[in-house]
C-alpha cells in the first residue's frame, strides 16, 4: 500500500461520493470563465453539454483523459478539481496516481513528482472536508480546494 492509498480512507471517500451532486459541480465549474468574459459562454456551454451533461463520454473516462493533461501542465487548482471529479466518478486514489505516473512518463519526471504532490494535497484537503462537521457538499469541497491551491 502506498502513501497515496492511506490519505483518504474508504469511509470519508464514501461520504464525499454520497454528498456529490454532478449538477452542482457542473454549475460551479461552468460559471467562472463566463463571469469574467461573457463571450466565452458558448464555448463553456458546448463543453458542459458534450462532456459533463451529455452521453458522449463517461465521467470516469473523461477524467482519465484530463488528469494527465493537467498534471503535465502544472495546473494546480484545475488538476485538484479534476482529481476530485475523478474520485467522484469512482476512480480510486491509486488509479489517479497511476494516471499521473503514466502521463509523467511522457511529459517528464518533474510532472510525476508535482502531479503526485498535487494529488496528496488534494486527498488531504478532501479528508479534512469529509471529517469537518456540516457535511461535504461540492461547494464546500471546491471552496476548500480553492483555498489550498491559491496562488
Model-derived features: positions:
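Residues at alpha-helix boundaries and short interhelical turns
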Residues: 55, 73-76, 90, 107-110
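Acidic, glycine/proline-rich low-complexity segments that act as flexible tails and inter-domain linkers
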Residues: 1-61, 112-151
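Short acidic alpha-helix initiation/capping motifs at coil-to-helix transition points
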Residues: 39-44, 72-80
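Alpha-helical scaffolds flanking conserved acidic
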Residues: 59-64, 94-99
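Hydrophobic alpha-helical segments of small multi-pass membrane proteins
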Residues: 67, 101-104
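Amphipathic, charged-and-aliphatic alpha-helical interface segments
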Residues: 61-76
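Mid-chain, well-packed structural core segment of small domains
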Residues: 77-97
Amino acid at each position: 500500500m502506498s502513501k497515496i492509498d492511506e490519505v483518504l480512507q474508504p469511509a470519508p471517500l464514501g461520504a464525499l461520493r454520497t454528498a456529490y451532486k454532478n449538477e452542482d459541480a457542473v454549475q460551479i465549474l461552468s460559471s467562472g470563465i463566463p463571469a469574467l468574459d461573457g463571450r466565452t459562454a458558448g464555448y463553456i456551454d458546448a463543453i458542459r453539454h458534450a462532456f459533463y451533461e451529455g452521453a458522449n463520454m463517461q465521467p470516469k473516462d473523461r477524467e482519465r483523459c484530463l488528469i494527465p493533461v493537467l498534471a503535465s501542465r502544472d495546473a494546480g487548482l484545475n488538476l485538484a478539481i479534476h482529481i476530485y471529479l475523478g474520485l467522484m466518478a469512482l476512480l480510486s486514489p491509486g488509479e489517479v496516481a497511476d494516471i499521473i505516473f503514466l502521463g509523467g512518463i511522457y511529459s517528464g519526471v518533474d510532472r510525476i513528482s508535482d502531479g503526485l504532490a498535487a494529488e496528496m494535497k488534494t486527498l488531504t484537503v478532501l479528508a479534512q472536508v469529509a471529517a469537518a462537521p456540516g457535511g461535504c457538499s461540492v461547494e464546500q469541497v471546491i471552496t476548500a480546494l480553492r483555498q489550498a491551491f491559491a496562488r
